[in-house]
Amino acid sequence: MKKFFIYLIFSLIISNTSLAKKSGCTGGNCNNGFGTWTYTDKTTYVGQWENGSKKGKGIETWPNGYVYEGQFNDSKWHGEGTLKFPDGSSYTGEWQNNKMHGKGIFKWSDGKVIEGKWNEGEYVK
């Protein structure tokens, strides 16, 4: 369970892409359409944009191996999505404002699984 909370805390940290300094649109339309944005730390977002914000389907990839693939709203993880960790662990389920929120499944790389509900990033049942 301790490892789960470490993953949870790290997912909250990396989900705040405002920590990554913006470098710019490196392909497509990053205002209204489909485009690629690359940050100075080499984090990338490839997906849909609306009014300059991530909205709709997209993939956010960090140089250290973390990958979020799913729905975005107002540049936040929001809706259905999967966060994959470098060690092979993953969370698939509902997100709200960059936090696990609603039904989801957390799978550790060793095969352990927690399935249930999350409330603002905390497992409730």
Predicted regions and their residues:
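Glycine/tyrosine- and acidic-biased, solvent-exposed loop/turn segments at the edges of beta-strands
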Residues: 3-5, 12-125
